[in-house]
Amino acid sequence: MKQLPWRADPLVWGHGPRVFEVFLEPTCPFSVRAFGKLDDLLAQAGEDRIMIKIRLQSQPWHMYSGVIVRCILAASTLAGGKEAAKSVMAAVAAHREEFEFERHCRGPNLDATPNDIIARIEGYSGVNVAEAFGIPDLDREIKWHCKYARQNGIHVSPTFMIDGLVQADMGSGDAIADWASRLLKG
């Protein structure tokens, strides 16, 4: 069977000169908080002034992180591209507890399979990711996100970079106005 060509749509919004990279793990509560602020940040700061790039930071203590990250990137290969991926991220964020283990080691998800997780994502997001999840070399995109984070010394989520420099003093609890102010000065 011949494999069809595919392309993962970059998770990038805005087209301004200031680049804000956000390293997120989709089930991390702090990443979820940061993710929830990105649309408002883009609106406040201006699409012509900043560019937001989401980098996926899979973390093994979030037990289904790898499956969920693959679903997000699979969604980015579909007709909706980055917006489909964003819908998957939003669905996971809105139902975070249903994709996580209690204290990272127990609870109902012990009995969940990757197919169960995919079905939940499809049900909540309305994005049919199952077929794209099976793209054999989709792992090259996953590995790119991992390698990019590692080369930049990123170990936790969320982590923020402005114009290629890690901003260790920025956090998900910061006000959107503070993020915007920081991005727009320079």
Spans of features found by a protein language model:
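A general structural-boundary detector
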Residues: 15, 58, 75, 104, ...
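Structural alpha/beta surface segment adjacent to cysteine/selenocysteine redox centers
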Residues: 21-26, 32-115
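Residue-level signal for cytosolic alpha-helical hairpin/rod architecture
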Residues: 17, 68-69, 126
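C-terminal cap of thioredoxin/glutaredoxin-like
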Residues: 2, 8, 22-44, 111-186
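Short beta-strand-to-loop junctions in surface cap/lid or active-site-entrance loops
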Residues: 7-16
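Glycine-centered flexibility motif
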Residues: 13-14, 71, 156
